[in-house]
Swiss-Prot record:
Additional free-text comment from the UniProt record: Present with 1510 molecules/cell in log phase SD medium.
Lineage: Eukaryota, Fungi, Dikarya, Ascomycota, Saccharomycotina
Family stated for the protein in its record: Belongs to the CSN12 family.
Domain of life: Eukaryota
Swiss-Prot/TrEMBL keywords: Cytoplasm, Nucleus, Signalosome, Transcription
Naturally occurring in which organism (per UniProt): Saccharomyces cerevisiae (strain ATCC 204508 / S288c) (Baker's yeast)
Gene Ontology MF annotations: double-stranded DNA binding; RNA binding
Main location: cytoplasm
Residue ranges occupied by any PCI domain in the UniProt entry: 232-418
One GO CC term, this protein: euchromatin
A GO biological-process term: conjugation with cellular fusion
Subcellular location(s) per record: Cytoplasm; Nucleus
UniProt function note: Component of the COP9 signalosome (CSN) complex that acts as an regulator of the ubiquitin (Ubl) conjugation pathway by mediating the deneddylation of the cullin subunit of SCF-type E3 ubiquitin-protein ligase complexes. The CSN complex is involved in the regulation of the mating pheromone response. CSN12 forms a complex with THP3 that is recruited to transcribed genes and required for transcription elongation.
Pfam families noted in UniProt: PCI
Protein name as catalogued: Cop9 signalosome complex subunit 12
Length: 423
């Protein structure tokens, strides 16, 4: 069966056969033959389409040869050549897309996605090669962003978020925080100006994984880079709620999307910090994530337990032993701020159980717990001074409603909600 690539451009549509032609790693069925016949096209369009067709054929051929080279241990050069061809194909397709309507957005995204996959396959690729891929994908993004087609049902702006996700991926690979920040600012300014549709009215809504991914990247940006923890929590929570899952009745378990682990790694500490929300480890969905993730199972149950119990020594031990992990995830600031939450919880427990909820509590009651970090060489007065400083910090940050009496060495709690953020 002949499949004419030119017909798709004549009819302004795509199907799985066109997508399979674009995907270099999809083998062409024996009874299928891709051809190009488009006699009505102008000379310039014909040249571009012919080149696009030839690049598609070359990529499939190069990929099949790459598989044999992989067995011989000569994979590096083959990968670089495949990446070069894929980048050239996307550059050319960008020029074709400029004159098309939004029917072509998804085929363009498939092409850009496979370029990123190629770039991520090899850890040996130099920075320049990855940046070149990023520039080509950015061109795809700007074509969508700046489309001036007055017919909204044909406008390519609906594809902005899907290409933004690809750009986020590249910038994270390059550890380029400035480019991430610029991309977020561009998108938000355009949304606020009503120049592009919001996420829930974009093409991403037809591909829910893209909605999950976009909210994940925004949650990571606000929660870990901008330290806007409330906003970070909001986007990560949205990402989690949109994650697809499948319940397998025969096993009684949930099959979860892999992205959920990444979301939970950021969401759990942000939920503890901003909302005092604790995960229910016995919930079947959360249990499924924990079972699959060594990082989650080894770190977070202990961290959550330290916050709930107000156990400062357990918190300090957890933060110290997993410091490298928290740094790699951009969570160092969040975990540091959690220390005040743990301390406040400790104060609350002393107020509840050691002081019978009286409004005035001597500081010696709190000091007697010996769970705050103090030096063995410090005398009691020095320890009380250090404790007052910590309490003053908690009061100033709004974690406690109280005031300190230095002369009486006590803390006086508000009679109405002395612990406003406790759960």
């Amino acid at each position: 069966m002949d499949v004419d690539i030119g017909c798709y451009f004549e009819e302004k549509r795509y199907d799985d056969k066109l997508l399979d032609f674009i995907r270099y790693d999809v083998k062409t069925p024996k009874k299928t033959k891709y051809i190009l016949q488009r006699p009505t096209a102008t000379d310039e369009e014909s040249v571009r389409l012919q080149r696009f067709y030839q690049l598609g054929v070359d990529l499939k051929l190069k990929y099949s040869k790459r598989r044999s080279l992989k067995k011989q241990g000569r994979i590096k050069n083959a990968t670089e050549e495949l990446l070069r061809l894929a980048n050239e194909q996307l550059k050319l397709f960008n020029r074709i897309v400029e004159r098309e309507t939004n029917w072509i957005i998804y085929p363009l995204w498939v092409m850009a996605k496979q370029l990123i996959r190629l770039a991520n396959e090899s850890s040996e690729l130099n920075k320049d090669s990855i940046e070149e891929c990023g520039r080509t994908i950015h061109r795809s993004f700007t074509i969508c962003l700046n489309d001036r087609n007055p017919r909204l049902n044909e406008n390519k702006k609906i594809g902005c978020y899907m290409f933004a996700n690809l750009e986020f991926s590249i910038y994270h690979r390059l550890s380029n925080k400035d480019m991430i920040k610029n991309l977020v600012k561009v998108l938000e300014s355009r949304v606020n100006a009503r120049d592009i549709p919001p996420l829930n009215k974009s093409l991403a809504m037809e591909h829910k994984s893209q909605v999950v991914l976009y909210n994940y990247y925004l949650g990571q940006y606000y929660g870990c880079l901008e330290n806007d923890h409330e906003r970070g929590f909001f986007h990560l929570n949205e990402a989690l709620l949109q994650c697809p899952m499948l319940y397998v009745e025969s096993t009684g378990k949930f099959v979860l999307q892999g992205q959920m682990e990444k979301i939970m790694i950021l969401l759990v500490p942000l939920a503890l910090l901003t909302k005092r929300l604790y995960p229910h480890w016995d919930h079947p969905v959360i249990a499924g994530v924990i079972t699959r993730s060594k990082r989650l199972s080894q770190v977070y149950p202990t961290l959550v337990r330290s916050v709930i119990s107000g156990n400062l020594s357990l918190y300090e031990a957890t933060a110290a032993s997993h410091e490298r992990f928290f740094l790699s995830q951009g969570l160092h600031v969040v975990i540091t701020l959690l220390r005040e939450v743990v301390f406040t919880r400790l104060v609350q427990r002393c107020w509840q159980w050691g002081n019978d909820r009286k409004s005035i509590m001597p500081l010696k009651i709190l000091l007697a717990t010996k769970q705050h970090d103090s030096s063995a060489n410090e005398d009691e007065e020095e320890q009380l001074d250090a404790l007052e400083c910590r309490l003053a910090s908690a009061i100033a940050s709004g974690l406690l409603r109280a005031y300190l009496s230095h002369s009486n060495r006590c803390i006086v709690f508000s009679k109405k909600e002395p612990f406003p953020h406790s759960k």
